[in-house]
Amino acid sequence: MATRIPFTESQWEELENQALVFKYLAANMPVPPHLLFLIKRPFLFSSSSSSSSSSSFFSPTLSPHFGWNVYEMGMGRKIDAEPGRCRRTDGKKWRCSKEAYPDSKYCERHMHRGKNRSSSRKPPPTQFTPNLFLDSSSRRRRSGYMDDFFSIEPSGSIKSCSGSAMEDNDDGSCRGINNEEKQPDRHCFILGTDLRTRERPLMLEEKLKQRDHDNEEEQGSKRFYRFLDEWPSSKSSVSTSLFI
């Protein structure tokens, strides 16, 4: 009686294939796709004859019935049909036509798309700086007085504005002080000090000192003229000399 082989030829091929897969797993290396394809061969081919299936598998050209869906990895991922092409897609049929960057799945344009997307959509932070120091013009208008309240004329006398509210004219005239009564009280505080209570009395005091000084000069000039008027005129001196 002839001894029978415990395994058939197809079973022996499957055992060798499983041994190779085990070696890859023991070495902690990725398993080649063709070994996984051999394991799934019974589900892909008909079980009519093992010889015909093996001959069709080991043929140099595969039948067109088997597409890229046959080469599946262990985690269910399909092998890329164009491995050198960028994998950026819109989720449907469109795919980027540029070549992938070395050691990357995407091109240079789509490599950092996800990282920069969140930061680019954020609006820039707005910085609010409190305006503590106001302009001199706005501060003067709010306080209700101007610097030219006392205007000095070319002759030396001081001209003050009085009466009802007046508008600024082209000739340099000043506003009336009644504007302060019409406007509500607006105080300007800078670091705990009130500009109205500190600056306005100082300015008025300087204007009053200037006016007193000009008045003294004017009175001195008048006294000098009166002293000269007491002397006899030249006509009277001539007449007296002729009379003698």
UniProtKB/Swiss-Prot annotation:
Biased composition (Basic residues): 110-120
QLQ domain ranges (all copies): 6-41
Predominant localisation class: nucleus
Signal peptide bounds: none
Tissue: Strongly expressed in actively growing and developing tissues, such as roots, upper stems, and shoot tips containing the shoot apical meristem (SAM) and flower buds. Also expressed in mature flowers, but weakly expressed in mature stems and leaves.
The UniProt record lists the keyword Transcription regulation: yes
Presence of keyword Acetylation: no
UniProt keywords, alphabetically: Activator, Nucleus, Transcription, Transcription regulation
Every WRC domain range: 80-124
GO biological process terms held by the UniProt record: DNA-templated transcription; leaf development; regulation of DNA-templated transcription
Domain of life: Eukaryota
Motif (Bipartite nuclear localization signal): 77-95, 113-122
PROSITE patterns named among the record's database cross-references: QLQ, WRC
Any one GO MF annotation of this record: ATP binding
One Pfam family named in its UniProt record: WRC
Region entry Disordered, spans: 107-133
Subcellular location: Nucleus
Domain notes: The QLQ domain and WRC domain may be involved in protein-protein interaction and DNA-binding, respectively.
Family: Belongs to the GRF family.
Free-text function comment from the UniProt entry: Transcription activator that plays a role in the regulation of cell expansion in leaf and cotyledons tissues.
Name the record gives this protein: Growth-regulating factor 6
Organism, as annotated: Arabidopsis thaliana
